From Swiss-Prot:
Pfam families: RuvX. Belongs to the YqgF nuclease family. One of its GO terms (biological process) is rRNA 5'-end processing. Could be a nuclease involved in processing of the 5'-end of pre-16S rRNA. One of its GO terms (cellular component) is cytosol. This is Putative pre-16S rRNA nuclease. Its main location: cytoplasm. Its EC number is 3.1.-.-. PANTHER family: POLYNUCLEOTIDYL TRANSFERASE, RIBONUCLEASE H-LIKE SUPERFAMILY PROTEIN. It comes from Lawsonia intracellularis (strain PHE/MN1-00). It is found in: Cytoplasm. Gene3D superfamilies: YqgF/RNase H-like domain.
Length: 142
């Protein structure tokens, strides 16, 4: 199965895609949040072009699994997305995915100005790869 992963953010949203077998995750792009309408047009277009079997959305939580304001914003985003796209949507809990993505990029020599442009995509890659590495019984569909 092919997946598109979304690391939703209020300024930038990172997108990653899997291979057709659902084994490896790759960065795709970041979508800049201008208006909600423009954002959803770009996102829906990208999803149709990629033709995934399902979507994976990162759900940020704290270390104790408690939810925050951004967690609620992501849940609201998922509700809006499900009205526009008729695909299964899976949640992938995430803690510090952007921080870990930044460390990944620094470790391979990315400079600060380049990191900013690809950070959200790399966070989406981390989210998607974590999802792909889970057994199917561990996956949470909404």
């Amino acid at each position: 199965m092919k997946y598109v992963a979304i690391d939703y953010g209020t300024k930038y949203t990172g997108i990653a895609v899997s291979d057709s077998m659902g084994v490896f995750a790759f960065p795709k792009q970041s979508i800049i949040m201008t208006t909600q309408k423009e954002f959803f047009i770009k996102l829906v277009e990208l999803i149709y072009v990629e033709s995934p079997d399902a979507l994976v959305v990162g759900l940020p939580v704290l270390f104790d699994n408690s939810e925050t304001l951004i967690t609620r914003q992501v849940r609201n985003f998922i509700k809006r997305l499900k009205h526009k796209i008729m695909l299964p949507v899976f949640l992938m809990k995430e803690i510090l995915s952007s921080y870990e993505a930044k460390l990944d990029l620094q470790s391979v020599g990315y400079r600060k100005n380049k990191i900013k442009s690809v950070l959200d995509q790399q966070a989406a890659v981390r989210i998607l790869q974590s999802f792909l590495d889970q057994s199917e019984s561990e996956r949470v569909q909404v």
